[in-house]
Curated annotation (Swiss-Prot):
Annotated family: Belongs to the universal ribosomal protein uL23 family.
Protein name per Swiss-Prot or TrEMBL: Large ribosomal subunit protein uL23
Keywords for this protein: Ribonucleoprotein, Ribosomal protein, RNA-binding, rRNA-binding
InterPro entries: Nucleotide-bd_a/b_plait_sf, Ribosomal_uL23, Ribosomal_uL23-like, Ribosomal_uL23/eL15/eS24_sf, Ribosomal_uL23_CS
Family matches, as PANTHER family: 60S RIBOSOMAL PROTEIN L23A
Segments traversing the membrane: none
Record-level GO BP terms: translation
Function according to Swiss-Prot or TrEMBL: Binds to 23S rRNA. One of the proteins that surrounds the polypeptide exit tunnel on the outside of the ribosome.
Keyword check for 4Fe-4S: no
Gene Ontology cellular-component annotations: ribonucleoprotein complex; ribosome
Organism: Aeropyrum pernix (strain ATCC 700893 / DSM 11879 / JCM 9820 / NBRC 100138 / K1)
Quaternary organization: Part of the 50S ribosomal subunit. Contacts protein L29.
Length: 86
């Protein structure tokens, strides 16, 4: 799966904004078929950062969310600003 096909959009709520600031974590809506490795590879290639950890879940509404924790040397807030999420 191509990196640009994996991520559908950035997911922004009060909770994800707090996670962005306190835990250095970005939240995305991704394709249901995407694996954690697909998400990690896509974020690293598209945004030029190093990913430490990816957690995924499928919501009751049927879409898949990915919580992507960046390595300490990168700031999630900088990436979110580039994306226009903050």
């Amino acid at each position: 799966m191509k990196p640009e096909e994996v991520i559908i959009r950035v997911y922004v709520t009060e909770k994800t904004t707090r996670m962005l600031e306190e835990e250095n974590t970005l939240t995305f809506i991704v394709r249901r078929e995407a694996t954690k490795n697909d998400v990690k590879r896509a974020v690293e290639q598209l945004f030029g950062v190093k990913v430490e950890k990816v957690r995924t879940l499928i919501t009751p509404r049927g879409y898949k969310k990915a919580y992507v924790k960046l390595a300490p040397e990168y700031k999630a807030l900088d990436v979110a600003t580039k994306l226009g999420a903050v």
